[in-house]
Amino acid sequence: MKYDLIIIGSGSVGAAAGYYATRAGLNVLMTDAHMPPHQHGSHHGDTRLIRHAYGEGEKYVPLVLRAQTLWDELSRHNEDDPIFVRSGVINLGPADSAFLANVAHSAEQWQLNVEKLDAQGIMARWPEIRVPDNYIGLFETDSGFLRSELAIKTWIQLAKEAGCAQLFNCPVTAIRHDDDGVTIETVDGEYQAKKAIVCAGTWVKDLLPELPVQPVRKVFAWYQADGRYSVKNKFPAFTGELPNGDQYYGFPAENDALKIGKHNGGQVIHSADERVPFAEVVSDGSEAFPFLRNVLPGIGCCLYGAACTYDNSPDEDFIIDTLPGHDNTLLITGLSGHGFKFASVLGEIAADFAQDKKSDFDLTPFRLSRFQ
């Protein structure tokens, strides 16, 4: 059988692509080296932020707004356990923060619902938070967080119900291109398609070693908290920048545990076995202490944590482009630790590519040619 589309990597973007392409009537094969959702990539740990006034650059705002529409649609499949939780997101940092300046600019350009608070206003609204006098907060009322593993599980189930073929626990070992399309090699045999999407995450270079993607080991952890830090008490998800530039992110507490991670830093790795479990690097359990001591002093000890990986591009912007020399193969990689919120729209973009539809978005900033 020759498929219309083969998806290599069915984590966040791949799961979405499988669903949207199958829903569009294509004959699709989803593949993954493991059984998604799983613990081997970048999507585990239950939750991911979604921010609209994007501090990483205005070019992302049209994408994230479409992503939000698609997340809302997906959430309707799980109304008893919603995939998107509109908790709000408070972005904290020094008044001269470049990141917060980008957030404010994005909000102004796209007329987003963002409220600016000074230090006293932040602490009055959320007494659990402590910030210096020179800090500001930009509160995104309509943002929140996503249930990452639930989202992937839902997409995969919906795709399967729509007739999508799924080949999991089966690594793709090679990709070949010829006049007839794309062939993938797996331990289970060879499969052909007219087009392919490569969204293999951290280890995409195992298949395409020429790509400028660097795996980085990262950790996040859950710390002892109480009901003051919960959604029920209107405690928001958050990003926070320390005076030294370190960037943190976190979520409202659930079951008396608050999840937090550090966005920058981490350990450069070159193989999967170098991504050692949480606590095998001495700094893992204490990485968030500088932020917690200064900004959330009421949070208690580290309860447990997990390791994941970022697939970093050189400039930490996404790579969305066809494979050089092969216009029938789309790459979506280099998501650099801020990609999950876009998984829905990136999956839709992949499905459009498979249907020979022109994208509704300007993807020029994400081309590989910027690294030449």
UniProtKB/Swiss-Prot annotation:
Pfam families per record: DAO (PF01266)
Cofactor binding summary note: Binds 1 FAD per subunit.
Protein name per Swiss-Prot or TrEMBL: N-methyl-L-tryptophan oxidase
Gene name of the record: solA
Oxidoreductase recorded as keyword: yes
EC assignment: 1.5.3.-
Record keyword Flavoprotein present: yes
Species per Swiss-Prot/TrEMBL record: Shigella boydii serotype 18 (strain CDC 3083-94 / BS512)
Cofactors named for this entry: FAD
